[in-house]
Amino acid sequence: MIGRIAGVLLEKNPPHLLIDCNGVGYEVDVPMSTFYNLPSTGERVVLLTQMIVREDAHLLYGFGTAEERSTFRELLKISGIGARMALAVLSGMSVHELAQTVTMQDAARLTRVPGIGKKTAERLLLELKGKIGADLGAMAGAASASDHASDILNALLALGYSEKEALTAVKNVPAGTGVSEGIKLALKALSKG
Protein backbone atom coordinates (compact mmCIF):
# COMPACT_ATOMS: atom_id res chain seq x y z
CA MET A 1 0.00 0.00 0.00
CA ILE A 2 1.05 3.56 -0.62
CA GLY A 3 0.01 5.58 2.45
CA ARG A 4 1.77 8.88 1.79
CA ILE A 5 3.31 10.62 -1.16
CA ALA A 6 5.77 13.51 -1.16
CA GLY A 7 7.23 15.14 -4.23
CA VAL A 8 7.05 17.99 -6.69
CA LEU A 9 3.65 18.96 -8.04
CA LEU A 10 3.94 18.87 -11.84
CA GLU A 11 0.32 19.21 -13.01
CA LYS A 12 -3.00 20.33 -11.50
CA ASN A 13 -6.18 19.59 -13.46
CA PRO A 14 -9.11 19.18 -11.06
CA PRO A 15 -9.36 16.63 -9.55
CA HIS A 16 -6.21 15.08 -11.08
CA LEU A 17 -2.62 15.74 -10.03
CA LEU A 18 0.73 14.56 -11.32
CA ILE A 19 3.39 14.37 -8.62
CA ASP A 20 7.07 13.68 -9.37
CA CYS A 21 8.70 11.47 -6.74
CA ASN A 22 12.38 10.99 -7.59
CA GLY A 23 11.74 10.74 -11.32
CA VAL A 24 8.52 8.71 -11.12
CA GLY A 25 5.29 10.57 -11.89
CA TYR A 26 2.29 9.48 -9.83
CA GLU A 27 -1.24 10.35 -10.94
CA VAL A 28 -3.34 11.18 -7.88
CA ASP A 29 -7.00 12.17 -7.65
CA VAL A 30 -7.95 14.49 -4.80
CA PRO A 31 -11.19 15.98 -3.43
CA MET A 32 -11.69 19.67 -4.19
CA SER A 33 -11.16 20.56 -0.53
CA THR A 34 -7.59 19.26 -0.87
CA PHE A 35 -7.17 20.68 -4.38
CA TYR A 36 -7.88 24.25 -3.25
CA ASN A 37 -5.15 24.00 -0.59
CA LEU A 38 -2.40 22.75 -2.91
CA PRO A 39 0.76 24.75 -3.56
CA SER A 40 1.59 26.04 -7.05
CA THR A 41 3.01 23.70 -9.67
CA GLY A 42 6.74 23.22 -9.28
CA GLU A 43 6.49 23.26 -5.48
CA ARG A 44 6.77 20.39 -3.02
CA VAL A 45 3.57 18.68 -1.89
CA VAL A 46 2.82 16.00 0.72
CA LEU A 47 -0.43 14.03 0.66
CA LEU A 48 -1.83 11.12 2.63
CA THR A 49 -3.05 8.50 0.17
CA GLN A 50 -5.39 5.59 -0.34
CA MET A 51 -4.58 3.10 -3.08
CA ILE A 52 -7.45 1.28 -4.77
CA VAL A 53 -6.59 -1.82 -6.79
CA ARG A 54 -9.15 -2.80 -9.40
CA GLU A 55 -9.04 -5.45 -12.08
CA ASP A 56 -8.27 -2.86 -14.74
CA ALA A 57 -6.39 -0.17 -12.78
CA HIS A 58 -4.37 0.82 -9.73
CA LEU A 59 -5.69 4.18 -8.54
CA LEU A 60 -4.22 6.59 -6.02
CA TYR A 61 -6.35 9.07 -4.07
CA GLY A 62 -4.73 11.87 -2.07
CA PHE A 63 -5.87 13.86 0.96
CA GLY A 64 -4.61 16.91 2.79
CA THR A 65 -5.70 15.66 6.22
CA ALA A 66 -6.01 12.36 8.06
CA GLU A 67 -9.69 13.14 8.72
CA GLU A 68 -10.40 13.34 4.99
CA ARG A 69 -8.68 10.03 4.31
CA SER A 70 -10.44 8.35 7.24
CA THR A 71 -13.82 9.63 6.04
CA PHE A 72 -13.02 8.45 2.48
CA ARG A 73 -12.32 4.97 3.86
CA GLU A 74 -15.60 4.95 5.80
CA LEU A 75 -17.50 5.99 2.67
CA LEU A 76 -15.91 3.12 0.69
CA LYS A 77 -17.30 0.60 3.20
CA ILE A 78 -20.86 1.53 2.22
CA SER A 79 -22.51 -0.69 -0.37
CA GLY A 80 -22.92 1.10 -3.68
CA ILE A 81 -20.40 3.84 -2.86
CA GLY A 82 -17.23 3.67 -4.91
CA ALA A 83 -14.13 5.81 -4.90
CA ARG A 84 -15.56 8.34 -7.39
CA MET A 85 -18.73 8.83 -5.34
CA ALA A 86 -16.73 9.11 -2.10
CA LEU A 87 -14.51 11.72 -3.76
CA ALA A 88 -17.63 13.60 -4.93
CA VAL A 89 -18.99 13.66 -1.36
CA LEU A 90 -15.70 15.05 -0.01
CA SER A 91 -15.59 17.57 -2.85
CA GLY A 92 -19.15 18.70 -2.13
CA MET A 93 -18.70 19.30 1.60
CA SER A 94 -15.98 19.36 4.22
CA VAL A 95 -15.53 16.50 6.68
CA HIS A 96 -16.97 18.75 9.40
CA GLU A 97 -20.04 19.54 7.26
CA LEU A 98 -20.51 15.84 6.51
CA ALA A 99 -20.30 14.97 10.22
CA GLN A 100 -22.84 17.68 10.99
CA THR A 101 -25.11 16.45 8.17
CA VAL A 102 -24.94 12.88 9.51
CA THR A 103 -25.61 14.00 13.10
CA MET A 104 -28.63 16.05 12.01
CA GLN A 105 -29.74 13.28 9.57
CA ASP A 106 -30.11 15.93 6.84
CA ALA A 107 -30.71 13.93 3.64
CA ALA A 108 -31.63 17.07 1.69
CA ARG A 109 -28.17 18.52 2.26
CA LEU A 110 -26.52 15.34 0.95
CA THR A 111 -28.65 15.30 -2.20
CA ARG A 112 -26.99 18.58 -3.22
CA VAL A 113 -23.84 16.58 -3.97
CA PRO A 114 -23.86 15.66 -7.69
CA GLY A 115 -24.70 11.98 -8.20
CA ILE A 116 -26.40 11.46 -4.83
CA GLY A 117 -30.13 10.91 -4.89
CA LYS A 118 -32.55 10.60 -2.00
CA LYS A 119 -32.10 6.84 -1.46
CA THR A 120 -28.31 7.04 -1.58
CA ALA A 121 -28.36 9.98 0.84
CA GLU A 122 -30.55 8.04 3.27
CA ARG A 123 -28.25 5.01 3.04
CA LEU A 124 -25.20 7.21 3.67
CA LEU A 125 -26.83 8.76 6.73
CA LEU A 126 -27.77 5.36 8.13
CA GLU A 127 -24.36 3.76 7.50
CA LEU A 128 -22.25 6.72 8.68
CA LYS A 129 -24.14 7.39 11.90
CA GLY A 130 -21.64 7.13 14.76
CA LYS A 131 -18.75 6.28 12.43
CA ILE A 132 -17.22 9.49 11.17
CA GLY A 133 -14.88 11.51 13.38
CA ALA A 134 -15.94 11.27 17.00
CA ASP A 135 -14.59 14.78 17.62
CA LEU A 136 -16.27 16.06 14.47
CA GLY A 137 -19.51 14.34 15.43
CA ALA A 138 -19.35 15.91 18.88
CA MET A 139 -18.80 19.30 17.27
CA ALA A 140 -21.75 18.70 14.96
CA GLY A 141 -23.88 17.61 17.91
CA ALA A 142 -22.99 20.76 19.79
CA ALA A 143 -23.71 22.81 16.70
CA SER A 144 -27.21 21.38 16.48
CA ALA A 145 -27.89 22.25 20.14
CA SER A 146 -29.11 25.71 19.22
CA ASP A 147 -30.47 27.22 16.03
CA HIS A 148 -27.40 29.34 15.33
CA ALA A 149 -24.74 27.30 17.13
CA SER A 150 -22.83 26.58 13.94
CA ASP A 151 -22.39 30.30 13.25
CA ILE A 152 -21.43 30.94 16.87
CA LEU A 153 -18.91 28.10 16.76
CA ASN A 154 -17.36 29.43 13.54
CA ALA A 155 -17.10 32.93 15.04
CA LEU A 156 -15.26 31.59 18.10
CA LEU A 157 -12.89 29.57 15.93
CA ALA A 158 -12.23 32.68 13.81
CA LEU A 159 -11.40 34.59 17.01
CA GLY A 160 -8.65 32.07 17.71
CA TYR A 161 -10.26 29.82 20.29
CA SER A 162 -9.51 26.09 20.07
CA GLU A 163 -12.23 23.70 18.92
CA LYS A 164 -12.46 22.27 22.44
CA GLU A 165 -12.91 25.72 24.04
CA ALA A 166 -15.42 26.79 21.39
CA LEU A 167 -17.45 23.58 21.74
CA THR A 168 -17.61 23.91 25.50
CA ALA A 169 -18.77 27.53 25.22
CA VAL A 170 -21.38 26.74 22.54
CA LYS A 171 -22.87 23.95 24.67
CA ASN A 172 -23.74 26.58 27.28
CA VAL A 173 -25.69 28.75 24.82
CA PRO A 174 -29.45 28.13 25.14
CA ALA A 175 -31.30 26.83 22.07
CA GLY A 176 -33.00 29.55 20.06
CA THR A 177 -30.43 32.21 20.98
CA GLY A 178 -29.53 34.58 18.13
CA VAL A 179 -26.02 34.61 16.69
CA SER A 180 -24.96 37.96 18.13
CA GLU A 181 -26.32 37.22 21.62
CA GLY A 182 -24.94 33.67 21.44
CA ILE A 183 -21.44 34.96 20.68
CA LYS A 184 -21.66 37.34 23.65
CA LEU A 185 -22.78 34.51 25.97
CA ALA A 186 -20.07 32.18 24.68
CA LEU A 187 -17.36 34.84 25.10
CA LYS A 188 -18.62 35.52 28.61
CA ALA A 189 -18.37 31.81 29.43
CA LEU A 190 -14.86 31.66 27.96
CA SER A 191 -13.70 34.68 29.96
CA LYS A 192 -14.82 33.00 33.19
CA GLY A 193 -12.71 30.10 31.98
From Swiss-Prot:
One of its GO terms (cellular component) is cytoplasm. Residues 144-193 are annotated as: Domain III. Its main location: cytoplasm. Residues 1-64 are annotated as: Domain I. The keyword Glycoprotein does not apply. Residues 139-143 are annotated as: Flexible linker. SMART domains: HhH1. GO terms for molecular function: ATP binding; four-way junction DNA binding; four-way junction helicase activity. Belongs to the RuvA family. This is Holliday junction branch migration complex subunit RuvA. The lineage of its organism: Bacteria, Pseudomonadati, Pseudomonadota, Betaproteobacteria, Burkholderiales. The gene is ruvA.
